[in-house]
Amino acid sequence: MIKVALPKGRLFEETVDLLLKRGIIEKRIEEGRKLILEEGGITFFLVKPSDVPVYVESGVSDLGVCGYDVYLEKKPSVYRLMDLGIGFCRIAVAGKPESEEKYFSSTHISVATKYPNIAYEFFKKKGVKADIYYLNGSVELAPLVGLSDFILDLVQTGRTLKENGLIVIEEVGKSTAWLIANKDSFRIKNGQIMEFLSRLVQHNKDGLQVQGSS
């Protein structure tokens, strides 16, 4: 039996819909207080999205559904098998409209983010010195109260930014959900994992991208 880490929150429903559509599970599993579920001969762990790569890299889970944003931030030693084509959003720098000119002209700024590693690498490549504040909550507050000049965060609809008087200033990248695998599990449970993967690929009518084990 393979074990799969599923992200709680916004990605959960999309992931379950995909598993149902591909015939991997027959009954809908629900997000609730129970954190270990079994369906279709698979054990599912419901975990915080940022914890998915931890469970997979450690071998507690054989597979996991992980946002590409989390993958870039954590850089886990896992195999990235397949772009699932769900959970699309942008990684972007945002701020007050009046700060846009400062963003493009200054060589020293401050940025609040849940993604300090992504932010560091991005601004390093731009040749901009960035004082990075790691926050685990609503980063939109930071430029409003003077903690930082800008934020770097996920943007899905842009509604939260708009409601707080912020705008997207520069796009850093795009993120979708990926299927990742533990390296040892991929070798030891290769048959089961490839069967799981083939069921996704076999019904691949939505243009899902298969990357391979690298």
UniProtKB/Swiss-Prot annotation:
Entry EC number(s): 2.4.2.17
Signal peptide: none
UniProt xrefs under InterPro entries: ATP_PRibTrfase_cat, ATP_PRibTrfase_CS, ATP_PRibTrfase_HisG, ATP_PRibTrfase_HisG_short
Record has Metal-binding as a keyword: no
Molecular functions (GO terms): ATP binding; ATP phosphoribosyltransferase activity
Protein localization: Cytoplasm
UniProt record similarity statement: Belongs to the ATP phosphoribosyltransferase family. Short subfamily.
This protein's domain notes: Lacks the C-terminal regulatory region which is replaced by HisZ.
Subunit field text: Heteromultimer composed of HisG and HisZ subunits.
Protein name per the record: ATP phosphoribosyltransferase
Species annotation: Aquifex aeolicus (strain VF5)
Name of the encoding gene: hisG
